[in-house]
């Protein structure tokens, strides 16, 4: 498609027959919108439901395919030279449509290609879409109002892409070409999508090759219209579009998909005929001819026996053999009967193919140049799959039960369907085998894991038993030691108590002795006054002693009470400390058990099949 500024004289391409001059004629130029408006949002949304769909270019159905420019026109009535086969014109036009056209060589312009290229200061392109910013407005730079997007853009990009799209482009790596600044953002979006998302027909795309030019705001629903646009673009930025088509096709091929969505049907091809079924003899049989040997004395023909015929073709697993007999004996016609199954038919067909490969099949047997005897006198056997006519010929002289029973059945029903069923059964069998193998592996793994865990548990229990026994021994030792210490201190306390009691007894004796001395000193000698004074003195001494004894007993009671209180306090402190020790031991044992607690065995789920 060409823009309004590139309309060609006569309304058709040069060389098409519509324009006698075949040159270029500039009719008019239209003012292009600012690049900011054209490319605004181009890379922001890749799937806009409100965007208008891309216009599809109509295809010509006249049998000739026209390239843009001065390309040749191939008519459908052109015939190839004798002896040189060529594809039909329709196929050639399809190939030409799917292939990138060659570079178009047009007539030179009057002033050459010296068009004014707009200059922009460096760094004025945005990072997201590569669009010019406010400092580089196409309307202000192009004061005359000409549309330079079709001409200058191609001219500018020809220099920019000269290193990427020249004759050496095929030698560049795919990644290098894909990372070009024009396509990098587009392919980054592609890589972020899954295959299902790529094939969504409702996903809309902008053409990265049309960036900053006509068609930049067009939407293409799905990758197929975008690929068609890139392959058929024939007037502006051809190299860029062909490169995009090549890269997109390679990228989709590496992702394992194509631009044609799965399930889309064009119905433009002729396939096989609707039915390929045929009737076959059932059970499968192979007719073996020339099995006659010689005539006996009664002029009756003798021939090969049943087992001998089976032995001759033992590689093909025939189940039975029968021979045809007539009034003159053996008729030289025999059949090998195979199992009534698809495998039996495949064996019969394999034997038939063997006869065909060594040219001893039906056609050779029916020809006038068949060889019945080989050098040395041996007879050459011929064979082929049995047909209804063959079976009727075989049963010509047979009546009643001697007739070889057969029936005509559908090939698809008896062979194809059974083979498909066998294939499905085989797949199911393989699936079940793999599942069983996985289950056995899983069971083996569980068994090994259980064995390891059981062994570790057994070892742990043995270690715990040893530790427990050692702890009991230590506990007994500690109890024995504590008992010894307790007895020792009890003995010491008893000694102290006995010493105290002895001291009290001595103290009481001393008091009694002193009192007795005082009483003995009371004699009747002396005057009455002296006796009275002595009695008073003795009485005072006794009273003082009694008073002193009472004070002693009171203080003794206080000391004993204080001692008992201290003992109670000490016992409380001891019990509290003992309780703290037991609590610390319990905490330490709990922490130790948590540390050495065995892992909980969890049986893994059945492996996914």
Swiss-Prot record:
Record localization: Cytoplasm
Chain intervals with Gly residues compositional bias: 10-24
Entry keyword set: Antiviral protein, Coiled coil, Cytoplasm, RNA-mediated gene silencing
Transmembrane segments: none
InterPro entries for the chain: SGS3, XS_domain, XS_domain_sf, Znf-XS_domain
Biased composition (Low complexity): 49-58
Ranges in coiled-coil conformation: 420-473, 545-584
Region named Disordered: 1-102, 116-174
Function noted in UniProt: Required for post-transcriptional gene silencing and natural virus resistance.
Family designation: Belongs to the SGS3 family.
Descriptive protein name: Protein SUPPRESSOR OF GENE SILENCING 3 homolog
Species whose genome carries this gene: Oryza sativa subsp. japonica
Gene name as annotated: SGS3
